[in-house]
C-alpha cells in the first residue's frame, strides 16, 4: 500500500478471491471471531485496493462482506441491547463491524444501517456495565483487550458525528 508496489496488490487480490470463494454461511461462519476477521479484512482490502480491482472482484468481495455483516447485524439487533454480558461482541465483533461499515458506507447502503446501530448502541451502553461504580466484573483480561476499540471508536465518532 505505502510503496504502491504491484506485488502487494497481486498477493492481496489472490487472498481476496480465495476468501470470496468460501461460503459465508458455511464453516467460516461457525466462529464469530473468524467470521468477523474475514469480514473486516475483506472490507479494508477492498477499500485500499478499490481502484485496482475489476468490477467482478469488487462485486464478489462486496457480496461476501454484506452476507457476513448482515449476519452479525441481524443476529445482534434487539438482542445485544438486552443482554447483560457479551464482552466478545464489545471487544471485537462490533469493532470489526464498525470498521467494515466505515469502509463500505459509500458502496453498500446497508453499511449505514450497521453504522447507525453501532453508534446508537455505543452511546447508550458503552462502556458496557460501567454505568455504576463497581459494575465491571469481567476481570482485567477483558479490560486489557478493549483500549484499541475504545480509542478507535471514540476518535471516529468524533470525526463523523
Locations of regions flagged by a protein language model:
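Aromatic-lined, polymer-binding surfaces characteristic
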Residues: 1-161
Amino acid at each position: 500500500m505505502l510503496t504502491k508496489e504491484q506485488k502487494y496488490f497481486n498477493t492481496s487480490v489472490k487472498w481476496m478471491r480465495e476468501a470470496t470463494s468460501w461460503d459465508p454461511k458455511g464453516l467460516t461462519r461457525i466462529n464469530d471471531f473468524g467470521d468477523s476477521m474475514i469480514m473486516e479484512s475483506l472490507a479494508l482490502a477492498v477499500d485500499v485496493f478499490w481502484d485496482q480491482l475489476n468490477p467482478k472482484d469488487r462485486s464478489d468481495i462486496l457480496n461476501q462482506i454484506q452476507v457476513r455483516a448482515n449476519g452479525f447485524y441481524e443476529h445482534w439487533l434487539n438482542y445485544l441491547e438486552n443482554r447483560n454480558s457479551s464482552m466478545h461482541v464489545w471487544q471485537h465483533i462490533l469493532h470489526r463491524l464498525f470498521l467494515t461499515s466505515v469502509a463500505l458506507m459509500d458502496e453498500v447502503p446497508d453499511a449505514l444501517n450497521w453504522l447507525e446501530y453501532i453508534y446508537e448502541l455505543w452511546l447508550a451502553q458503552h462502556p458496557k456495565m460501567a454505568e455504576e461504580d463497581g459494575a465491571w466484573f469481567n476481570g482485567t483480561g477483558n479490560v486489557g483487550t478493549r483500549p484499541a476499540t475504545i480509542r478507535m471508536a471514540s476518535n471516529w465518532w468524533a470525526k463523523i458525528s
